[in-house]
Amino acid sequence: MTPTNVVSMDFETKEAMEDFLETYERDSPTLYPDAEMLLMIKTTETSCVGVSVYPNEEARSLAGSRTSGKLKYLVKENFRLSGDMVVKHVFTNKGELND
């Protein structure tokens, strides 16, 4: 079991999203120290999707309780999906698959 969160976020302005992304890039390793992977994808000028992967449910729950509200003030609207990652392919070198 690999607990995974997928969060879609919309922002009032491009600047608000840029502020969020700057803060997330700088602070997310300390806000989510138990995460195995943190990924943020810009989908429009004012929205993005984040993916976070944890080693177990306890780590995911702890991260949620530790960070709720710390970055939320920058987000206009969001929705969260939680589940278990069932397929993972990581390519570290072109042509090589490392799972």
Task: List the predicted regions and their residue ranges.
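Short S/T/G/P-rich N-terminal loop/turn motif that feeds into the first structured element of a domain
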Residues: 1-69, 73-99
